[in-house]
Amino acid sequence: MSASRKTLVVTNDFPPRIGGIQSYLRDFIATQDPESIVVFASTQNAEEAHAYDKTLDYEVIRWPRSVMLPTPTTAHAMAEIIREREIDNVWFGAAAPLALMAGTAKQAGASKVIASTHGHEVGWSMLPGSRQSLRKIGTEVDVLTYISQYTLRRFKSAFGSHPTFEHLPSGVDVKRFTPATPEDKSATRKKLGFTDTTPVIACNSRLVPRKGQDSLIKAMPQVIAARPDAQLLIVGSGRYESTLRRLATDVSQNVKFLGRLEYQDMINTLAAADIFAMPARTRGGGLDVEGLGIVYLEAQACGVPVIAGTSGGAPETVTPATGLVVEGSDVDKLSELLIELLDDPIRRAAMGAAGRAHVEAEWSWEIMGERLTNILQSEPR
């Protein structure tokens, strides 16, 4: 790919700092020719950043502050990199606010500017001042990527009609997220203290109100009445944990808080479940919403049927053959769906197989990487 258009990725969200946008950029960049990529990123911890950057096969230039803002000083530094590295594309890893520097990128010689959205722009679009910022970004970038049809519907008018909108959600590593063999599933369940026939519901996410772990706990008395040995596994950490633990007091024998697991342990736990459920619900008058929900897709890749919430883009991750959708605050309906699936192993197996096929066909990193390559390597319109 010697003729590749060279891309400068400008971002505050880059490893070793942990987070969703950081993972999104890291994994998308890994699908590209490393010689075509330069990253310009902020620095949260200089020592950790230096050690991490040495492991990469593309160049990373660090802004020596923990936050990069679209100031004249930052814009000047970015422009220097564009000129010195003969950059063709500038890709703002998160559109707001750094893509306010899109005009400077063009003036410095970049012929195409791409900016990615991740869902928080929905909130920006609802506030007059920040909505004006989105319109300025929309008038200066060439391509805006979005993670779900829901987020696009919510903020498209704020950005205006100038940019091309491209669907670019995260992919799933279908080589790591795979259905468990019977032996591996049994071993994971034994480690958790379960048998091969224990009904297991898993939820893997940050512990925050939007994700719906509280609704799952509230549904457990009805589930336990139908299946007394049913177990709910809550994987993850967050500020809502103490509230959830108090809520689970009366069902503590059937609810296990596993905390944040190592990556492979998380996958093993997910693949050992009978159902993955995260009944996400929109909160804060529409400001607190599920942009997409990659965990639903990871569960499907593991061959596990899914119960998703109605919030934001969550319903877009499943098909009628692979998962069910429920209003996250409707505990009675949630418990009904959980019991129906736990009582029907044939249906669960069919949904799991369909889920795996769905993710392989539509959501793998190979597919998403090709989509990004087309965006970056196509000539400006």
UniProtKB/Swiss-Prot annotation:
GDP-alpha-D-mannose binds at R206, K211, L261, E298. Pathway: Phospholipid metabolism; phosphatidylinositol metabolism. The keyword Protease does not apply. InterPro entries: Glyco_trans_1, Glyco_trans_4-like_N, Glycosyltransferase_grp1. It catalyses: a 1,2-diacyl-sn-glycero-3-phospho-[alpha-D-mannopyranosyl-(1<->6)-D-myo-inositol] + GDP-alpha-D-mannose = a 2,6-O-bis(alpha-D-mannopyranosyl)-1-phosphatidyl-1D-myo-inositol + GDP + H(+); a 1,2-diacyl-sn-glycero-3-phospho-[alpha-D-6-acyl-mannopyranosyl-(1<->6)-D-myo-inositol] + GDP-alpha-D-mannose = a 2-O-(alpha-D-mannosyl)-6-O-(6-O-acyl-alpha-D-mannosyl)-1-phosphatidyl-1D-myo-inositol + GDP + H(+). Changing E290D: Reduces mannosyltransferase activity by more than 95%, and weakens but do not abrogate binding of GDP-mannose. GO terms for molecular function: glycolipid 1,6-alpha-mannosyltransferase activity; phosphatidylinositol alpha-mannosyltransferase activity. Disruption phenotype: Cells lacking this gene are unable to produce monoacylated phosphatidyl-myo-inositol dimannoside (Ac1PIM2) resulting in the accumulation of Ac1PIM1, the absence of LAM and LM-A, and the presence of LM-B. One of its GO terms (cellular component) is membrane. Its EC number is 2.4.1.346. Changing G291S: Reduces mannosyltransferase activity by more than 95%. GO terms for biological process: glycolipid biosynthetic process; phosphatidylinositol metabolic process; phospholipid biosynthetic process. Keywords: Glycosyltransferase, Lipid biosynthesis, Lipid metabolism, Phospholipid biosynthesis, Phospholipid metabolism, Transferase. It is an enzyme of class 2 (transferase). Involved in the biosynthesis of phosphatidyl-myo-inositol mannosides (PIM) which are early precursors in the biosynthesis of lipomannans (LM) and lipoarabinomannans (LAM). Catalyzes the addition of a mannosyl residue from GDP-D-mannose (GDP-Man) to the position 6 of a phosphatidyl-myo-inositol bearing an alpha-1,2-linked mannose residue (PIM1) to generate phosphatidyl-myo-inositol bearing alpha-1,2- and alpha-1,6-linked mannose residues (Ac1PIM2). Belongs to the glycosyltransferase group 1 family. Glycosyltransferase 4 subfamily. This is GDP-mannose-dependent monoacylated alpha-(1-6)-phosphatidylinositol monomannoside mannosyltransferase.
